[in-house]
A protein has these predicted regions:
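Noncatalytic alpha-helical scaffold of FAD-dependent oxidoreductases
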Residues: 1-244
Length: 244
């Protein structure tokens, strides 16, 4: 919920309309949760995710550690075009990414000097290699991909684990969606898959540079009480989009 366009709500950094840069420093001001659990939720009705969000933020005694949404289309793009990112982070960790990005940039600079090499040479090589890698997602996630359009990865800690588990069992006993509690492998896979979504879109553009004009990021501010949050673009715009 943002109020930059509402002068009545201007206070300090709020409503600065780009005239002020705000920096935040993350400090270890509270102990890390010793007990955490990740719940993978699937549904074909966005109202069910809205109910879960409102309950978690308004009724739970323990707030979620995180909540990550994935649409089926994004799931599919990341599955194909984020596979190598998934494996790199799984094997080497995120701390190695800067070195790998630097190597990628050097390869691309070299590729530009060699006339017969294609544009985005490194991306196309890595995409070819990723096709040779084994399947990286658990069967449970693939089953949910086939059954449900909307996915939510909900991470809880401490007392919130039992609280969320009890709520989800009760809620989905009377609704069309479902959930499962992730084991260690599923937890890692779900988080890495969600992480790979953004880079997968960039990879898709690079691999299909003869088809895709560019990426468009839509940053949409919603009111706190909006229940209908799923984007519905005008037909004249929607029919020009390859994937979203």
């Amino acid at each position: 919920a943002r109020f930059n366009a509402d002068p009545a709500r201007h206070y300090e950094a709020s409503g600065c309309a780009g005239k002020l840069m705000v920096f935040a420093v993350r400090l270890d001001t509270f102990p890390q949760e010793k007990q955490t659990a990740v719940f993978y939720i699937g549904t074909n009705d966005i109202n069910e995710l809205t109910d879960i969000r409102r309950a978690a933020l308004g009724e739970f005694e323990s707030l979620p550690v995180s909540g990550e949404y994935i649409h089926r289309d994004a799931f599919d793009i990341a599955d194909v075009y984020g596979k190598d990112t998934f494996y790199v982070i799984k094997k080497f960790g995120t701390h190695q990414l800067p070195k790998l990005f630097d190597l990628k940039a050097r390869v691309d600079r070299f590729g530009k000097k060699v006339s017969f090499l294609p544009k985005h040479f490194s991306d196309k090589v890595m995409q070819f290699v990723s096709k040779l890698l084994p399947d990286h997602l658990p069967k449970s996630m693939r089953d949910y991909r086939d059954k449900y359009e909307h996915h939510l990865i909900l991470k809880m800690g401490g007392k919130g684990v039992d609280e969320a588990r009890a709520f989800l069992k009760e809620y989905f006993a009377h609704h069309g969606g479902a959930f499962f509690e992730c084991n260690a492998e599923e937890t890692q896979a779900a988080m890495l898959h969600r992480f790979a979504v953004a880079s997968a879109a960039i990879r898709y553009r690079a691999v299909h540079d003869d088809e895709v004009e560019d990426l468009v990021a839509l940053d949409i501010a919603l009111r706190r009480d909006d229940r209908d949050w799923f984007e519905k673009l005008p037909l004249e715009i929607d029919n020009k989009i390859i994937h979203k």
